[in-house]
Amino acid sequence: MDNTIIRRAREGRIDDEMRKIAEAEGVSPEKLRDRIAKGQVVYIRNVKWPSEKVVAIGKGLSTKINVNLGTSTEVVDLDSELKKVEVANKWGDTLMDLSVGGDLDAIRRAVISKSKLPVGTVPVYQAFIEAFNKRSGGAYFTIDDLFNTIERQLKDGVAFMTIHAAVTKEAAIRVLKSDRVIPVVSRGGDMIIGWMLHNDAENPYLTHWDYLLELFAQYDAVISIGDALRPGAVADAHDEFHVGELVEAARLAKRAIKAGVQVMIEGPGHVPLNDVIWTIKLEKRLTGGVPYYVLGPLPTDVAAPYDHIASAVGAALAAAAGADLLCYITPAEHLSLPTVEQVEQGAIAYRIAAHIGDVVKLGRKARRWDDEVSYYRGRLMWDEMIKRLVDPERAYKVYTQYGPPKVKGCTMCGGYCPMNMVIQQARRLK
């Protein structure tokens, strides 16, 4: 464990990795080092398979977005998933392979090979599915099966993993007896809960946490503590199960940081808009600033097939309040496996949400982008403005969708463009 990035930071060392991150993020190497040492910043990578893109997540850094992809039991199309990787490479900062159908090892290795980004997984999926195929029951996987799967995926180059360690057997039993609208919506969490109930045993991640830390330290990979009991309906947000699991996750995160292992915490989920800021502040208070990786949040249950729009509202507010990594949501959420196009729609929505949040969280540093666009828009310098937009290619297509404008303005106002008239009046004043 002595050579993990946290250990090096605690020794006061600033190495080439830290300098590279600091330069990319526009922060001082000393501040970055101190935040890594405290567990407030994580560097997403596997030392055995460094990704092309440098990705650091946490305090004082730009908000990052994660793109989920992967096969289902109903749709196994590797070519399509690899096209989604290309979308992630263009728009995202990290990606997760959530495949549950087909040859999981082959799919994961193909995704890692194609990706320019750090790749994450949920290892219990593979342990559960392989046990189901071999023993006719997913909950029949052994603890050795689970940890062998984790080690195999780390050896393949997986940089971070969702580990549902914070749900206890007692909490699992109580949530299933509760009056929650939807007791459990986490697929990986459900698999761990099923294992605990089938085996009448405590969460294997929880009972073997120290061994798990040793595994991750070998690769300096990041543990992302999953939220098995995250609210799947706005009515369930911040109930005893949601908050109780977050408290346990905070305890586990502190143990990981003490051991020199990088860690994030995952968050909701479905949360009313008026509670989004509060849930971010709560995580930061409980953990001392451990990076928060949130799904959405989605502030309404009624928006499908427009959940990418609805959740981007929650995501922007979450980022402004201090969320560090946003897990995107696509138009297919709650309805279907997403297509390549839907993956891109979700990724773009979240790229915009992340920037909106950063304008608040990082201030002038993030707002320079907006200021440049507005400068050129106000002077009708269309080429300069368009190439600075979030999606210049689509922007140009929209700008010319009725043919090249016949006047200096666009086809919306035409000759009555207010900026054009202001420019002419300003010239007269001079």
Curated annotation (Swiss-Prot):
GO biological process, one term: thiamine diphosphate biosynthetic process
A GO term, aspect molecular function: lyase activity
Functional pathway: Cofactor biosynthesis; thiamine diphosphate biosynthesis
Pfam families assigned: ThiC_Rad_SAM (PF01964)
Function: Catalyzes the synthesis of the hydroxymethylpyrimidine phosphate (HMP-P) moiety of thiamine from aminoimidazole ribotide (AIR) in a radical S-adenosyl-L-methionine (SAM)-dependent reaction.
Cofactor: [4Fe-4S] cluster
EC number: 4.1.99.17
Enzymatic reactions: 5-amino-1-(5-phospho-beta-D-ribosyl)imidazole + S-adenosyl-L-methionine = 4-amino-2-methyl-5-(phosphooxymethyl)pyrimidine + CO + 5'-deoxyadenosine + formate + L-methionine + 3 H(+)
Name of the top EC class for this enzyme: lyase
InterPro entries xrefs: ThiC/Bza_core_dom (IPR038521), ThiC/BzaA/B (IPR002817)
Family from the record: Belongs to the ThiC family.
Gene3D superfamilies: Radical SAM ThiC family, central domain (3.20.20.540)
NCBIfam families, per the entry: PRK13352.1 (NF009895), thiC (TIGR00190)
Protein name: Phosphomethylpyrimidine synthase
Residues bound to Zn(2+): H270, H334
